[in-house]
């Protein structure tokens, strides 16, 4: 064979043979120089997004840790605190639909950066009331600045040195104090600041997660999302720890002489420096915005995601309505042109049964989550007699790390075992069921009510009493002119707490430094006392001896439950991402976030708070006579309301999760069979084509070149 023929053969062999009308599957891989910027920028975005998640989670965790502090500082009920907490979701609701839909078609990193700035400003606004309100005034018994002087608490109204109840004040004095008390409405700034936080946080999840999922490889997407979600859990750890630290500092630190403060962090009237953490969180949020202004609008897609639209597994669950969802290109894209596909996109999402059912499941589950997390510090304080600082410390250092570990473990499991969509749904359901069963055991790990004379036990300390305001008075204090609206708890030698030293019938008192001791208390004397004394000290008595052990058991079960439930977080999120069209991903995440905010984030803290308020035994009163925050809860009723609501919502969530798995299996089996049939036909066709290609290659070999066989 001549040289020209050999060159033609070599050239032909180097060229892939393609059938007529079939596109080439040859892909030109970018060089290492081309790959590096893409991977580098994606990792920069991953780090920036993780830091933003940390910042927003820090502020959110800190807000949860200051719920009790805000309630006491502004003297408002739990239901109103729930409204303040829900204002974050209201802010999300205002813009989530537009941000998730239009933001996906614009410069996503810059939109996230702008959101961080708004979020930081809102966080700083929350702290502003501290600098405009008058100093915090708590109800206190002040015998005298002279430590050697003894005054009878029983003759409270006759002493000009002591504060009296608003019920005994003259109308003119009440009117004057009401004018000063207008600062209590400053909680509206906390509401507005949290509202701004919600608006600023809106683009972070739908645009950030979709950006990662778009440009990361399919194998790494779950791992990257798991990393982001894990960092997001680390944020609340620092948030609750910061809350624990600030709760130990007096609210007006730097503004008053702390030597004059007679209460301690264990006192139910104590308010910590709740505002300090918001200043720190606000600055961190502003710093988190910086990297996003320098990131590109888009990145080169990963090689494994080039054909993601035709993924065989994903196609089993996505309903194709043959609508062409085109994204306008260029900076001059018109708003009306982008809005044209809004309703068809929305119809496509809600027409997807897997997406719709999972949306319902998550909404119910997040109702229980939002309500439980919002009032968990209060539950620990009231149920186990712990201080606010200790409750926040325990949640931040023990409970939340278990959640972070569970989320990270879920991402690792998804990556390592390459779990399918059905497998992800099973893992999600399994973790929910197991966590639900563990949670049921918390009903048995409660503490009994503290013995409070006239509220939970009689003045003789022998039998429980039903709550009635007049039950605070008894024969032992009938000659004392006491206020029934005050809350100045005194712990008697008999282990019973009295609403005030006056209601305990105490005749004399002594003050030594910050300690106040009451003597000759007639009501203490009629109840059994271990020492036989009829004295008492300022503050509530500790819970019974078995309560610390119950608290330890509660922590252990709570940690295991948190880990188990969070293990299904990433599988559930991957299920959400894989059951929708790629071009609708940001929009679907936005609608998902919208539903969670509207149907869970806003109402859950409110109705949890309203129902928790029904367990209040002793309300505080403001200077104008209106009802303030709750001073004492019925521990048993509180426990059954708090845990019962969570269990009811968890039951509904599990039933919906079973429905999701049923739909997935039904679609998987039917479409998988159809896919196999098509695959068999394709394999037969491919085998025939390969035989022809092999014959063609054989005919082109130098040792076989018969001139008469011209057909290929």
Curated annotation (Swiss-Prot):
Record's subcellular location: Cell membrane
Gene3D superfamilies, A to Z: MFS general substrate transporter like domains
Effect on the protein upon substituting residue 130 to H: Gain of pH-sensitivity of E1S transport
Membrane-spanning segments: 44-63, 83-103, 110-134, 185-213, 233-253, 272-296, 349-370, 391-414, 419-442, 555-577, 587-612, 647-664
Entry keyword set: Cell membrane, Disulfide bond, Glycoprotein, Ion transport, Lipid transport, Membrane, Transmembrane, Transmembrane helix, Transport
Its membrane topology: Multi-pass membrane protein
GO molecular function ontology, one term from the record: thyroid hormone transmembrane transporter activity
Catalytic function, reaction form: 3,3',5'-triiodo-L-thyronine(out) = 3,3',5'-triiodo-L-thyronine(in); L-thyroxine(out) = L-thyroxine(in); L-thyroxine sulfate(out) = L-thyroxine sulfate(in)
Disulphide linkage map: 476-506, 482-502, 491-523
GO (cellular component) term, any one: plasma membrane
Tissue: Highly expressed in brain and in Leydig cells in testis. Localized in nests of Leydig cells (at protein level). Expressed in choroid plexus (at protein level). Not strongly enriched in cerebral microvessels.
Extracellular side stretches: 64-82, 135-184, 254-271, 371-390, 443-554, 613-646
Biological process, per Gene Ontology: bile acid and bile salt transport; monoatomic ion transport; positive regulation of thyroid hormone generation; sodium-independent organic anion transport; thyroid hormone transport; transmembrane transport; transport across blood-brain barrier
Chain ranges of the Kazal-like domain: 470-525
Cytoplasmic side: 1-43, 104-109, 214-232, 297-348, 415-418, 578-586, 665-712
Glycosylation sites: 146, 510, 520, 533
Principal subcellular localisation of the protein: membrane
Keyword Glycoprotein (UniProt): yes
Function as written in the Swiss-Prot or TrEMBL entry: Mediates the Na(+)-independent high affinity transport of organic anions such as the thyroid hormones L-thyroxine (T4), L-thyroxine sulfate (T4S), and 3,3',5'-triiodo-L-thyronine (reverse T3, rT3) at the plasma membrane. Regulates T4 levels in different brain regions by transporting T4, and also by serving as an export pump for T4S, which is a source of T4 after hydrolysis by local sulfatases. Increases the access of these substrates to the intracellular sites where they are metabolized by the deiodinases.
NCBIfam families assigned: oat
PANTHER family from the UniProt entry: ORGANIC ANION TRANSPORTER, SOLUTE CARRIER ORGANIC ANION TRANSPORTER FAMILY MEMBER 1C1
Family membership noted in the UniProt record: Belongs to the organo anion transporter (TC 2.A.60) family.
Name the record gives this protein: Solute carrier organic anion transporter family member 1C1
Organism: Homo sapiens
Gene name linked to the record: SLCO1C1
């Amino acid at each position: 064979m001549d040289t020209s023929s050999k060159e033609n053969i070599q050239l032909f062999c180097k060229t892939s043979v393609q059938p007529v009308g079939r596109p080439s599957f040859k892909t030109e891989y970018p060089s290492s120089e081309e790959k590096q910027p893409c991977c580098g920028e994606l990792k920069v975005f991953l780090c920036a997004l993780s830091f933003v998640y940390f910042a927003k989670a820090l502020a959110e965790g800190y807000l949860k840790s200051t719920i009790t502090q805000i309630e006491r500082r502004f003297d408002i009920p739990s239901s109103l605190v729930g409204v303040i907490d829900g204002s974050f979701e209201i802010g999300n609701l205002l813009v989530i639909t537009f941000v998730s839909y239009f933001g996906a078609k614009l410069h996503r990193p810059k939109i996230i950066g702008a959101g961080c700035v708004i979020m930081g400003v809102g966080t700083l606004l929350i702290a502003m009331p501290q600098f405009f309100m008058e100093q915090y005034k708590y109800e206190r018994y002040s015998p005298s600045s002279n430590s050697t002087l003894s005054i009878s608490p029983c003759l409270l109204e006759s002493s000009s040195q002591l504060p009296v109840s608003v019920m005994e004040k003259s109308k003119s004095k009440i009117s004057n104090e009401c004018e000063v008390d207008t600062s209590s409405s400053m909680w509206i700034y906390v509401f507005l600041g949290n509202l701004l936080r919600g608006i600023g946080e809106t683009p972070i999840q739908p645009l950030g997660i979709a950006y990662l999922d778009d440009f990361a490889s399919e194998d790494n997407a779950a791992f990257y999302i798991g990393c982001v979600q894990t960092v997001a859990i680390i944020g609340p750890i620092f948030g609750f720890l910061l809350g624990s630290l600030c709760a130990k500092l007096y609210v007006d630190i730097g503004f008053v002489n702390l030597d004059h403060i007679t209460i301690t962090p264990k006192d139910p009237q104590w308010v910590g420096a709740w505002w300090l953490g918001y200043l720190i969180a606000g600055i961190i949020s502003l710093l988190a915005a910086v990297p996003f202004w320098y990131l590109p609008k888009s990145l080169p897609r990963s090689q494994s995601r080039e054909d993601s639209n035709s993924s065989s597994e994903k196609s089993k669950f996505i309903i194709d309505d043959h609508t062409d969802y085109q994204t306008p290109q260029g900076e001059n894209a018109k708003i009306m042109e982008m809005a044209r596909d809004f309703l068809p996109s929305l119809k496509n999402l809600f027409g997807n049964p897997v997406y719709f059912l999972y949306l319902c499941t998550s909404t119910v589950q997040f109702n229980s989550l939002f309500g439980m997390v919002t009032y968990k510090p209060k539950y620990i304080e009231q149920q186990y007699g712990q201080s606010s600082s200790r409750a926040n410390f325990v949640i931040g250092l023990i409970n939340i790390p278990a959640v972070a570990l569970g989320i990270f473990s879920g991402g690792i499991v998804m990556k390592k075992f390459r779990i399918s969509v059905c497998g992800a749904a099973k893992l999600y359901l399994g973790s929910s069921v197991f966590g639900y069963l563990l949670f049921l055991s918390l009903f048995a790990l409660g503490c009994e009510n503290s013995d409070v004379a006239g509220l939970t036990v009689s003045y003789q300390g022998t039998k429980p009493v039903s709550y009635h305001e007049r039950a605070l008075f008894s024969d032992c204090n009938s000659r004392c002119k006491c206020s029934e609206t005050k809350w100045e708890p005194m712990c008697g030698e008999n282990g019973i707490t009295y609403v005030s030293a006056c209601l305990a019938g105490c005749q004399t008192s002594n003050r030594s430094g910050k300690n106040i001791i009451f003597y000759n208390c007639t009501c203490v004397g009629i109840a059994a006392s271990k020492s036989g004394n009829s004295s008492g000290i300022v503050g509530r008595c500790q819970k019974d001896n078995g309560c610390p052990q119950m608290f330890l058991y509660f922590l252990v079960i709570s940690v295991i439950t948190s880990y188990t439930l969070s293990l299904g977080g990433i599988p559930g999120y991957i299920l959400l991402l894989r059951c929708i069209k790629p071009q609708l991903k940001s929009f679907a995440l936005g609608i998902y976030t919208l539903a969670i905010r509207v149907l869970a984030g806003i109402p859950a803290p409110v109705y949890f708070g309203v129902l928790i308020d029904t367990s209040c035994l002793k309300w505080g009163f403001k200077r104008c006579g209106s009802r303030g925050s709750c001073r004492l809860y019925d521990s048993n009723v509180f426990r059954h309301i708090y845990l019962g609501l969570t269990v009811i919502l968890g039951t509904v969530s599990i039933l919906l999760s079973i429905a999701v798995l049923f739909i997935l299996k039904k679609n998987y089996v039917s479409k998988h069979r159809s896919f196999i049939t098509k695959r068999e036909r394709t394999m037969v066709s491919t085998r025939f084509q390969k035989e022809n290609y092999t014959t063609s290659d054989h005919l082109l070999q130098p040792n076989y070149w018969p001139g008469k066989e011209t057909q290929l």
